[in-house]
Regions:
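Zn2+-dependent metallopeptidase catalytic domains
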Residues: 1-196
Length: 196
């Protein structure tokens, strides 16, 4: 497997805001196609689902990362605008009864073959994840679960932004000097050390 690194120069808030809706639509279509199919085995279900969703999760991971390290109003806006859709999509896939049933069927096909231990574990964890995501819930319980999950994601983002804001605002007055988070984190005398 070849490692693919992101094109950081191209990745701007404007690019992410344009690309995320396109990826969400493409991934939704791909997941619907997988749900409509019959599993031909582990590779067909697991790898196809992973291949379909990976571009979206990779971009979203970079958005979250850049939102925390660059933390501009533009990155925050992208994160706040798209987080509800990403949470809803994640819950929709996690609560897909069809994907859950397909995973159970493929797991059953694997049997007790010792060579398939890793594949069995991947499927077992996928099934467990769906159960923790509320695949068995219906009606008001499912609505409540989804509302709590969305609110939890929103609060997590607000908390992270508050920590970043508080860190940026930090200052310490000591010995007639004010230190901030942007100052070098070593004493002035260290600047003159030949082997620092």
């Amino acid at each position: 497997m070849m490692m693919k690194f992101p094109d950081w120069k191209r990745l701007t808030p404007k690019f992410a805001a344009k690309e995320l809706p396109r990826l969400l639509d493409a991934v939704e279509t791909a997941v619907a196609a997988i749900e409509a199919s019959e599993p031909k085995g582990f590779e067909y279900l697991v790898w196809r689902l992973d291949d379909a969703t990976r571009p979206l999760w990779d971009l979203w991971g970079m958005v979250r990362h850049l939102s925390s390290v660059m933390n501009s109003a533009a990155w925050r806006r992208v994160e706040e605008d798209f987080q509800p859709r990403l949470v809803a999509f994640s819950l929709r896939v996690g609560q897909s009864r069809r994907l859950y049933d397909l995973a159970k069927r493929v797991l059953k096909k694997l049997g007790k073959d010792p060579k398939a231990a890793t594949r069995r574990r991947i499927l077992e964890k996928s099934i467990e994840g769906a159960e923790h995501c509320g695949v068995g819930l219906e009606g008001r319980k499912k609505e409540r679960f989804n509302a709590v999950a969305a609110r939890l994601a929103e609060l997590g983002t607000k908390f992270a932004n508050s920590v970043i804001d508080a860190t940026k605002a930090f200052s310490l007055k000591k010995g007639g000097r004010t230190y901030t988070i942007d100052d070098a984190n070593y004493p002035e005398t260290m600047r003159e050390c030949p082997d620092r």
